[in-house]
Amino acid sequence: MKRQLGIALLGALLLSVGCNPIKRLSDTEWDHYRALRVYMSEDERNAFLKNKTEEERNEFLQALGLWDRFYQYPEDVRELILSGDVARGWTKDKLLMAWGRPYDMQKLAGRDTYRSERYIYRFEEHEDGRLIIWTKGSKTAYKAIRIFERTVILDDDVVAEIKG
């Protein structure tokens, strides 16, 4: 019985090696990859995923200068970023790590700040209540019960308003 279990586990391990490289990531790695991929080009994302060990992947992020962007925050703030609970007062960096690049963005004039921007994000709402950030070419949008937008106003790189 133990031998069969060992063989089954070995088989599952061998099958997983050839699978999607994202599935190889530990929960912690997936968390920082998900937050930091917004700052990586497609080539950098692929290079990150090609690294064989967690140590190599972590060193890769450090070499790109991205590691501290996420780990500068205390654990409770990192958890808020990962859960997507964007709130007024958040920095632009935290917003981008939580929701990624916006669907659309515009410079705003006439506000009492040095720099003001409007970021528009699209979301998919699914039957089970999940919200997924919509991206161009989404493969899940057809399952959504609705697609809606949220507008975020950034004043001097700080979230000032969230509408929608």
What are these regions (language model features)?
Residues 1-8:
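Bacterial N-terminal signal peptides that target proteins for export
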Residues 8-9, 155:
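Intrinsically disordered, low-complexity segments enriched in polar/charged small residues
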Residues 16-18:
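C-terminal motif of bacterial Sec signal peptides marking the signal peptidase cleavage site
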Residues 20-164:
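Residues within mature, well-folded domains
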